[in-house]
Amino acid sequence: LLEQGKGPLVLLCPGWPELSYSWRHQIPAIADAGFRVVAPDMRGFGRTSAPADVGAYTLFDNVGDMVALVAALGEKQAVIVGHDWGAPVAWHAAMFRPDVFTRVAGLSVPPPFRGRGLPLETLKNNGITNFYWQYFQTPGVAEAEFERDVAATMRIILGGRGFSDPSAHQFVQDGKGFL
C-alpha cells in the first residue's frame, strides 16, 4: 500500500500484472493537488493474501476489498481510479457502491458494456477463440507455461514482444501458448 497527502481520498487501482508501485509517478502530483492518495496492491498481488480458490477473485470480491479499504482508512467516501484490470474494479465499485465511490475514472478499459452475454461468451459468439482471457481459463495451462521461465514471462508481459501491431499480444496461437 502506498499513501501520500491529506484531503479527500483517491484510490488508485493498478492493472494486471502490476502493483501499487505502478502509480509512483502519479501519487505525488495528486497529493500535491490536495488529495489523500492511496494505491493498494490488488488481491493476490504483492504482499496481499492470495486465496487458492480462483472463485475468490471476482469483481464483487475486489470491489468489497476497496469498500473495506475505504473504511479501514477511516473514510466514508473516495474517488476511485483504475488502470487496465483495475478499471473494471473501479467502474463496478462506482456502480455497486455509489454511496462510497463518488467519482470514478478508468484508464485503458471502458465502462462495462451491457452486452447480451458474459464477456467470454461474447468473444466466442463473435468467432474469437484465441484471446488471452480464454487461454487463462484452462486451469494449470498458463501457470505451467509462465513458471517454466519466470524472467522471460515478465519481460514479455511487461515489455512486449516487438509486434508491429500492439494488439497482437492479446492473442494466443493454437498450440503455441501465450509466450
Regions found by a protein language model. Give the residues of each.
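Conserved HGGG/HGGXW glycine-rich cap/lid loop of the alpha/beta-hydrolase fold
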Residues: 2-49, 69, 83
